[in-house]
Regions:
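Histidine/acidic residue-rich metal-binding segments in metalloenzymes
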Residues: 126, 161-181, 187-254, 260-282
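Di-metal (Zn2+ and/or Mg2+/Mn2+) metal-binding site signature of metallo-dependent hydrolases
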Residues: 76-99
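Histidine-rich, glycine-flanked metal-binding segment
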Residues: 2-80
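Active-site neighborhood of phospho(di)ester-bond hydrolases with catalytic His/Asp-centered motifs
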Residues: 79-85, 113-116, 144, 180-182, ...
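Divalent metal-coordination and catalytic microenvironments
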Residues: 30, 46, 51, 75, ...
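Divalent-metal coordination cores built from histidine and acidic residues
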Residues: 2-17, 21-22, 97-208
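Short, ordered loop/turn segments at secondary-structure junctions
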Residues: 58-59, 115-118, 146-148, 184, ...
Length: 283
């Protein structure tokens, strides 16, 4: 969006908020889960213009016109959409388009995907196909460049092998936000040249580094892994995993899926230990 279009969009939101123009959609009488303040605020109305929220408050009746769609929340909770912090579309045996079609009705409004499975088969062109398809979705689909292709060298027959040069190229693509989960955690703390070169390319491009420390040892190897650059991690399963990652400056990802049920154990870092929830991520 250029500056002119942004200014026009903002003026349109202002007009709706002031009651000078009708909203496209109004949701009335919900319980607003305000993530900014940590409150649940009953009796809240929301007015929407286009793809943006123009008004959130106790009474949006001034924004309702003859063509405004009105939804009665009747006390239901109004929560922000889920930004799924880490997932693999290919694991669902679906394209990006069909995956989005499946999850949007359940409240997912953005996804952070690591297409290392398609990269294992098609290499860099496969990643580019995922990036291009992600760009035309109705929600934000952010793509990370796979860091470990193949994922198990010597134990599989992949269709491609990717390294620092491919990572450097991918970092120039619109839609690539960083380096995907660094699954080769021993390579990080043992100083593997290829692994550190990939991390270096991503950092040079100003991108984020995804983590994957799948070990219970929170001693020197864990500290060395964090020092190597990964910024988040979804592999924690215990309360102490969440605490250690948070204290070391990482963003702990609390994972809930068909194979992993790690939220209940790790969320105790917030509910029982009182740690700041703002750096925790759901995936």
């Amino acid at each position: 969006m250029n500056a002119y279009d942004d200014a026009n969009m903002r003026r349109g939101l202002v007009d709706v908020a002031m009651g000078r123009a009708p909203a496209d959609l109004v949701i009335r009488d919900g319980r607003w889960v305000c993530v900014q303040s940590g409150e649940i605020i009953p009796g809240t109305d929301i007015a929407v213009k286009g793809e943006r929220i123009a008004y959130v408050g106790p009474d949006a009746s001034h924004t309702i016109g003859k063509d405004t769609q009105v939804i009665e929340a009747a006390g239901r909770y109004l929560v922000p959409g889920l930004l799924d912090g880490h997932m693999h579309v290919e694991s669902g045996m679906l394209t990006v388009t069909e995956f989005v079609r499946a999850v949007v009705p359940h409240g997912t409004t953005a996804m952070f995907v690591d297409p290392h499975e398609i990269a294992n088969v098609f290499g860099l062109p496969g990643v580019r196909l995922m990036v291009d398809e992600a760009a035309v979705q109705p929600i934000h689909v952010y793509v990370q460049m796979p860091s470990c292709v193949p994922s198990a060298p010597g134990l599989e027959t992949p269709g491609a092998s990717l390294g620092p040069a491919e990572v450097a190229e991918a970092m120039t693509w619109p839609g690539i936000i960083g380096l995907g989960e660094v699954m080769n955690f021993p390579g990080v703390y043992f100083g593997d040249e290829k692994m550190h070169a990939e991390i270096g390319e991503a950092r040079h491009a100003g991108k984020v580094i995804g983590g994957h420390y799948a070990a219970p040892d929170l001693g020197l190897p864990f500290h060395a892994y964090v020092a190597g650059g990964p910024e988040d991690d979804h592999e924690g399963t215990r309360l102490e995993d969440a605490v250690a990652r948070l204290r070391q400056g990482m963003k702990p990802m609390l994972r809930l899926g068909s194979a992993w049920h790690d939220v209940a154990s790790q969320i105790k870092a917030v509910t029982e230990l009182g740690l700041d929830p703002h750096r925790f991520i759901l995936c």
